[in-house]
Amino acid sequence: MLVIGLTGGIGSGKTSAANIFSALGAGVVDTDEIAHELTQSGGRSLPAIRRAFGEKYITPEGALNRKEMRNLVFNDTDARRKLEAILHPLIRDEVSRRVGLAQGPYLIIVVPLLLETGHYRGIVQRVLVVDCSEGAQISRATARSGMNEQAVRAIMVAQVSRDERLGQADDVIVNNADLPNLERQVRALHKKYMTLAQGS
């Protein structure tokens, strides 16, 4: 099966693009979605997170306290590595399981840090980057997450630069406009990927 790695900076529109691909019939595996499942109440990562970080980072409902953890890991590299050491193996296991079950003519794996970690480069045949201006990233990310501009910029600095991301892309979606514009670009790529999938 043809496997596409979909990536992009915070607020670029990765999830919106993935949802359109899914509606067109592509298989979609989203690593952010998996991470949320692992860290919600009853999630498989929580016992290890509780042991490593303490009750302060668990909500009264038993889920990861994302705000507290975000504040910690952006100021403490060791804490970030410790959290990644817990989450990343669990995410990779679940990605492998879902890839094995995937239906559809081709598969999109949504990996925000595809180029930073390199974890999934071995299973993707193409890299699709969703790109947008820095201003669009900041306004979307602050509106969606409730983070302030400073927090969003801190995340952007931790990610590879736009130029570096675009330099590693096989395909690019430019998401500076509206949803119909995004849909047109996704439909064009869907046609391309259907053709490539038939040849693979």
UniProtKB/Swiss-Prot annotation:
Assigned EC number: 2.7.1.24
Catalytic activity: 3'-dephospho-CoA + ATP = ADP + CoA + H(+)
A Gene Ontology cellular-component term: cytoplasm
Domain DPCK stretches: 3-200
SUPFAM superfamilies found in the cross-reference section: P-loop containing nucleoside triphosphate hydrolases
Single GO BP term: coenzyme A biosynthetic process
Enzyme class at the top of the EC tree: transferase
Keywords per UniProt: ATP-binding, Coenzyme A biosynthesis, Cytoplasm, Kinase, Nucleotide-binding, Transferase
Pathway it works in: Cofactor biosynthesis; coenzyme A biosynthesis; CoA from (R)-pantothenate: step 5/5
Physiological role: Catalyzes the phosphorylation of the 3'-hydroxyl group of dephosphocoenzyme A to form coenzyme A.
Family: Belongs to the CoaE family.
PANTHER family: BIFUNCTIONAL COENZYME A SYNTHASE-RELATED, DEPHOSPHO-COA KINASE-RELATED
Name of this protein: Dephospho-CoA kinase
Native source organism of the sequence: Nitrosospira multiformis (strain ATCC 25196 / NCIMB 11849 / C 71)
Gene: coaE
